[in-house]
Amino acid sequence: IVHNCGGLCYYDGANLNAVMGTVCPGDMGFDVIHLNLHKTFSTPHGGGGPGSGPVGCKSMLVPFLPSYVVDGEEELEFVKEPQSIGEMKSFYGNFTVIVKALTYVKTLGREGIPEASQNAVLNANYMMNKLKDLYTMAYDEVCMHEFVMSLADLKKKTGISAMDIAKGLLDNGIHPPTMYFPLIVEEALMVEPTETESKETLDEAVEVLRKLYEIAETDAEQLHQAPVTTPVTRMDEVGAARHPYLRYEWQD
């Protein structure tokens, strides 16, 4: 429908971890794609950055790409197409991050790439099925590489929010999942085990989440105070929002 109306389709590479090596976004009808290298291709992200997100497109859009494009095989040259939108940046992003992603792809190989995706999907479904008798699943069906829990019912019953459960995970040595996303799910926790976790670590995470649910029902205040074992305890988010420090204060 979009193509018939003269539009183009854009693929968010954040979900590629579930399908890489199995399907081709171009064959699915997409014209442009960005790749989240930190999510699918094992590169650093955020505080461990820098992040990087290469953009790919179909051949019909190549004449319009920003300049300069590297062309050639034996000898490389910079090319600027007549219809190019011109220069956007004076550099080509975080090159070393792209090299690391390429190394990861070549290490996995043709068989390893789809296997990684299949393991990611398997791990997510395993965890979801181990938790759905306690936690409410936003979408109670077979998932891809991640699943979303809604803690809205738990909050109404006990006063414990998704934030409280996330903080409780820290006290148990587990990094919290993505909180409050997607925005359309109330009290959301989006869990993405990834392909690298073993059954043992998945079972450990499930055990902790089930324990936190029990604590929410029996001793909610314990989770309201969490984390208590980390070097930095719970931040005053309201105070930070109302009285932000936006620049460093130099000492006289």
Residue ranges, per PLM feature:
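Glycine- and other small-residue-rich loops at beta-strand/loop junctions that grip anionic moieties
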Residues: 11-14, 90, 94, 116, ...
